[in-house]
């Protein structure tokens, strides 16, 4: 099943001072988005995006359960001091890279 950017509307925004942690979270987002286009989940989370957003990144999933799995696995794998959840939304669709 393919997904489009508008399907990825279950978002979670996190803050981390460490770009390496952001890289780990990007990989974890792709791992947790088990169907559709998993790369959409971590769109707009590269270094320039992270810096521009004040060291915040937003991941967007196509299902609520994928976001829940992401939170569970991030907490299991990464020390809590390395990142913090700022917000979650169910109505925050991803946008293509050219927008």
Each predicted region: which residue ranges?
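Short S/T/G/P-rich N-terminal loop/turn motif that feeds into the first structured element of a domain
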Residues: 1-27
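Short, flexible, solvent-exposed loop/turn segments with mixed acidic/basic and small polar residues
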Residues: 1-4, 41-52
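Short cationic amphipathic helices and targeting signals
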Residues: 12, 54-62
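Helix N-cap motif at beta-to-alpha junctions
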Residues: 17-18, 60-68
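Short amphipathic alpha-helix segments
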Residues: 18-44
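Conserved short beta-strand edge segments in small beta-sheet-based binding/regulatory domains
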Residues: 38-40, 78-92, 99
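An amphipathic, aromatic/His-enriched active-site/gating alpha helix that lines ligand/cofactor pockets
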Residues: 64-84
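Catalytic "initiation/cleavage/transfer" segments centered on a nucleophilic residue
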Residues: 67, 98-99
């Amino acid at each position: 099943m393919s997904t489009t950017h508008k399907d990825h509307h279950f978002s979670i925004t996190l803050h981390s001072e460490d770009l390496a942690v952001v890289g780990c979270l990007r990989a974890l987002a792709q791992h947790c988005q088990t169907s559709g286009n998993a790369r959409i989940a971590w769109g707009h989370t590269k270094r320039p995006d992270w810096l521009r957003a004040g060291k915040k990144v937003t991941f967007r999933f196509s299902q609520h359960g994928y976001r829940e799995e992401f939170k569970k696995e991030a907490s299991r794998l990464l020390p809590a001091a390395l990142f913090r959840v700022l917000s979650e939304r169910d109505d925050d669709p991803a946008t293509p890279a050219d927008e």
